[in-house]
Amino acid sequence: MHLTQNYIEILNIFVIKTSRHTACHLITDVTELFMPLALFALTISAFAIGTTEFVIVGLVPTIAQQLAISLPSAGMLVSIYALGVAIGAPVLTALTGRLPRKQLLVALMVLFTAGNLLAWQAPGYMTLIVARLLTGLAHGVFFSIGSTIATSLVPKEKAASAIAIMFGGLTVALVTGVPLGTFIGQHFGWRETFLAVSMLGVIALISSQLLIPANIPGRAAASIRDQVKVLTHPRLLLIYAVTALGYGGVFTAFTFLAPMMQDLAGFSPAAVSWILLGYGVSVAIGNIWGGKLADKHGAVPALKFIFAALFVLLMVFQLTASTQYAALATILVMGIFAFGNVPGLQVYVVQKAEQFTPNAVDVASGLNIAAF
């Protein structure tokens, strides 16, 4: 009888422990499922924001014609957006530091959507300027806090990959969103492009509301001393400089990629469009690969390798630019490395800010975004 009772007690203990073990695994599985969904919400938002950032380039001639303004004036819409990013990234990020991250993220997507709706209904040039400034402000703060939100959703060893997933929305916008938006603008009018982007903003808003965890707290407001330290700490200044020079060099090459492939390599304008699409696909692949590389080997070793490869590829392109197939191969390989540095740069500045200025991490992230 006692033996049977002992067996029953042992069985009960086994069942309880097994149940706890199973429950732990179940919670882990649910968490692992939830995190990618939350990152997916950030990616959708990044895609919407990336589309409105880049699509204006293809709409400048149409806007200039319909609003009866000069091409340089229409081109100012690009500069005004960049000004909004530069202001929004460090300044508004610092001012909104105490707000819960989800609440701030949803508010940003409301501002972004409202800005694009204003652009859709803009009666004139000045209203369009205001609309672009508002969306630029939302852009700056989003990518500042988006990086820290993304890293908070995953273990530290996957931080760079999480940032890469978020920035993947930006690269996909470059590949698909911009050509699609330009197509809409050319066939239905530039206003309808902003309406379409507004719809993306609504989708991003709903996704953020449903999928982003509500328990991500805001940070303590950065004091003046903390903000000054973010602007003066040698290691952080070095990271900002690396971001500005390294990414700036790549983006300069991208800016003149189309004329170089057309005038030097001899490709037709139609072929150049396909080449840019292929370059965008390479960029999207390289972004994810760069995040995994930084997670596996560390941000600094990954960045050293990527920047060294970009240096070699840019030098090689001087030799291959006048030969079609060699130029094409160089460009496609360059695309893999072109955005591969972004996850490493962003996760590195977050890591160093947590070490040197723990009360101003989002501000440091914002300054690094502004350096892009």
Question: Each predicted region: which residue ranges?
Answer:
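Extracytoplasmic
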Residues: 41-71, 253-258
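Conserved MFS/SLC helix-loop-helix module at the cytosolic interface between two early adjacent transmembrane helices
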Residues: 89-123
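A late C-terminal transmembrane helix in Major Facilitator Superfamily
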Residues: 358-372
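Helix-loop-helix hairpin linking two adjacent transmembrane segments in secondary transporters
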Residues: 125-127, 156-157, 164-210, 256, ...
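Cytoplasmic helix-loop-helix junction between adjacent transmembrane helices
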Residues: 133-168
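Intracellular juxtamembrane helix-capping segments at the cytosolic ends
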Residues: 142-154, 340-355
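Helix-breaking motifs and short loop linkers at transmembrane-helix boundaries and internal kinks
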Residues: 68, 100, 121-126, 266, ...
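Paired small-residue
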Residues: 126-134, 325-333
